Structures are given as C-alpha cells and as structure tokens.
Curated annotation (Swiss-Prot):
Site residues by UniProt (Role in the control of polyamine-mediated channel gating and in the blocking by intracellular magnesium): 160
Positions of modified residues (Phosphoserine): 385
SUPFAM superfamilies in UniProt: E set domains, Voltage-gated potassium channels
Transmembrane segments: 66-92, 143-171
Domain notes: There are two PtdIns(4,5)P2 binding sites: A canonical site where the phosphate groups of one PtdIns(4,5)P2 molecule are coordinated at least by residues Lys-67, Trp-68 and Arg-176; a non-canonical site where the second PtdIns(4,5)P2 molecule is coordinated by both KCNJ11 and ABCC8/SUR1 residues.
Name of the protein in question: ATP-sensitive inward rectifier potassium channel 11
UniProt binding sites for K(+) 2: 133
Cytoplasmic side: 1-65, 172-390
Residue intervals on the Extracellular side: 93-116, 134-142
Modified residues (Phosphothreonine): 341
Compartments in which it is found: Membrane
Primary location: membrane
Molecular function GO labels: ATP binding; ATP-activated inward rectifier potassium channel activity; metal ion binding
Length: 390
C-alpha cells in the first residue's frame, strides 16, 4: 500500500493548505501576557501574602472590594448572628428573673410574653429592626434589660449603616462610569507634520462630561540593566500631545491623542518589523477625570501590544457639522486608512531626511493614471460626391 507522503506533494498536505509553500515556515512565538487588559483590568495575581490581617484593618474597603454574593452573604450572616446572640441574652435574662415559668415567677417580668427561646428570638428581631408588634415589651423591673435594649439598638444601627454604605459604594464605583469611556481597538503610527507619531483615539459615549480629564501613557517592556539585572516590567512614561499642550483634554467629542516619536521617546528605535514579530512591548493608556454628575474620580485604562499597533495608517474623520451642530459617527470610531509612511525607525528618519523627501515626492505624484489611447474615427460606409448633386 502506497504511503500518503509518496502520492501527495508536501505543499498540498492538509496542515499546509492555508500556508504559502514559497515562504519559509516559522515557529509561532508565544504571545506576551498583558499587564493591563483591553477592558482595563490589571492582569496580576497576588500570591503568598503572609500578613493577611492587614485586610481586616480596613474592613470597609475589604467589604466594598468583595463580590456581591460574598458581601450579601456576610451581611445576612451578620444580622442572623446578632439576632441569635441577643436572643440568647434575652432568654438568659428571662431565665434568671424566673419569667419562663409564669406560675412560679415574679409578678412583673423583665420582658413580657417571653416563655421560650423562640419568643426571645422573635423579640430580638422586633427590637433590632424596630418592627414593634406590641405583644412583647421591656418593663421597669430589670435595669439590665433596659441596658441590653440600648446596646442592641446601637448594634443594629451600626450594621445597617455599614451595609448601606457598602451597597452605595459598590453601585457608585468609579469603574462603572469608565464603561462608557472607549478607546480605539488599534493604535497607529504615521507621519504628522513630518514626524512619526504614535496615535490613538479616545471618546466618551455619555453627554455628562468628565471634568479635568487627563491622559497618561506608559511603555511596559522587559529590560536588562548594564549590571545584568532583569526587570520584567520596566515602566517608562512618555508624553502625550493633544493639540492644546499638556496632558489635559476637553473630552466633549472623540479626540486623537498623539505622541511624537523623537529622541526622548522609548519608541525611537521601533521598526515596522518589530510589530509583526510580537516584540516584548506593551503601551498602557490611562484616562482619568472627575465625573460631572457625582464628583467621583474615575479612571479608564487600556493597553496595546505590538501586534495591535498599525504602521502606516491613520484614523478616519468621524466628526461632521450637520444642522448647526457637530455629529459623531461612532460606527467609524476605530476605522483607519493607509497613508504613505516610511518603513524605518524614527532614528533612521532623523538621520536620513531624504527618506521623507522621497516619500513626499512619491505621494505628490499621486497614483498612476490609465494612459488614454486616442480612438480612431470610423470611416463612413458611403460618401456623397459633388458630382452626384448636380
């Protein structure tokens, strides 16, 4: 029986049907783990924390950071435990005063209508949540019962205050507002005013504005110091420009934030080939500001890996003037178009400006036009001579 390898050429094997046989085969490089996800979550797992008690020193923040199921479970258990604890206290008071045996006890009980632990538990719930059915009440017979009544009311108010505060903070957290702050899926590198620039687009879907909005950008990459120390997450700040100078932005409409790649930029030696080979590079973008309606500071984050940066492309315009006002077409928010861009690093472009001149000359000529071929006039099938008219 003939083997499959002998009758089927290698370029038509199933494993290579989607490949080009003329190109060499490369081993797929494992993609670098993100430090910040596209949605802004930090991809960090904390392990082997020895001092767990530090979380209990800030109980309120710990409760707010917990999941909803855990938070509601803790408050439910807090109410049940407090009711059971004070029910035991009320039962002990009634037992010590002899109120559990009405025939043999005192004439005036400490708490009326308590004859068992069940009735003591019901009275504990009535006291703490101020239901007030009226069937059970504390009398003047036992000063200790009056003191326990005051303590249970204070404990109930404290639990209610903490619960309401946690629920309010969890529903009004800053990251809820950040859900409507959007970034472009890809970043681009193209020429702007003769310089290579790293650009991205940011927008706000809500009509309520972000006050004092600022934007920051950092490059995170793995580096090695001259002494041989390996820094897995080396963070370098890079300046952003938005047309008005500084990091402050007026985010009333989508903006294109750009960073000029100059000699002080960590992207100065970045080449187009580095983007295709998944270079160990991540650019983190942080947008921060104050919510106009609530006054809470919010922060939106995203990141771009090397393969999410498009070289030689530019964002399409999405803001147009219609009927006396500006309209934004968010369906084109992340759309880009190709533009002439030198395939070299910013360092090479600064050292050899002729690359830019050649690119400008090529773009000035424009695309090749189809050569017009003159069309020969067709000869008439018959002609009229002057002699035939005479």
């Amino acid at each position: 029986m003939l083997s499959r390898k002998g009758i089927i050429p290698e370029e038509y094997v199933l494993t290579r049907l989607a490949e080009d046989p003329a190109e060499p085969r490369y081993r797929a490089r494992e993609r670098r783990a993100r430090f910040v996800s596209k949605k802004g979550n930090c991809n960090v797992a904390h392990k082997n924390i020895r001092e767990q008690g530090r979380f209990l020193q800030d109980v309120f923040t710990t409760l707010v950071d917990l999941k909803w199921t855990h938070t509601l479970l803790i408050f439910t258990m807090s109410f049940l435990c407090s009711w059971l604890l004070f029910a035991m206290v009320w039962w002990l008071i009634a037992f010590a005063h002899g109120d559990l045996a009405p025939g043999e006890g005192a004439a005036v009980p400490c708490v009326t209508s308590i004859h068992s632990f069940s009735s003591a538990f019901l009275f504990s719930i009535e006291v703490q949540v101020t239901i007030g059915f009226g069937g059970r009440m504390v009398t003047e017979e036992c000063p200790l019962a009056i003191l326990i009544l005051i303590v249970q009311n204070i404990v109930g108010l404290m639990i209610n205050a903490i619960m309401l505060g946690c629920i309010f903070m969890k529903t009004a957290q800053a990251h809820r507002r950040a859900e409507t702050l959007i970034f472009s899926k890809h970043a681009v590198i193209a020429l702007r005013q003769g310089r290579l620039c790293f650009m991205l687009r940011v927008g706000d879907l809500r009509k309520s504005m972000i006050i004092s909005a600022t934007i920051h950008m950092q490059v995170v990459r793995k580096t090695t110091s001259p002494e041989g120390e390996v820094v897995p997450l080396h963070q370098v700040d890079i300046p952003m420009e938005n047309g008005v100078g500084g990091n402050s932005i007026f985010l009333v409409a989508p903006l294109i934030i750009h960073h000029v790649i100059d000699a002080n930029s960590p992207l100065y030696d970045l080449a187009p080939s580095d983007l295709h080979h998944h270079q160990d590079l991540e650019i983190i973008v942080i947008l921060e500001g104050v919510v106009e309606t609530t006054g809470i500071t919010t922060q939106a984050r995203t990141s771009y890996l090397a393969d999410e940066i498009l070289w030689g492309q530019r964002f399409v315009p999405i803001v147009a003037e219609e009927d006396g006002r500006y309209s934004v077409d968010y369906s084109k928010f992340g759309n880009t178009v190709k533009v002439p861009t030198p395939l070299c690093t910013a360092r090479q472009l600064d050292e050899d400006r002729s690359l830019l001149d050649a690119l400008t000359l090529t773009s000035a000529r424009g695309p090749l036009r189809k050569r017009s071929v003159p069309v020969a006039k067709a000869k008439p099938k018959f002609s009229i001579s002057p002699d035939s008219l005479s």
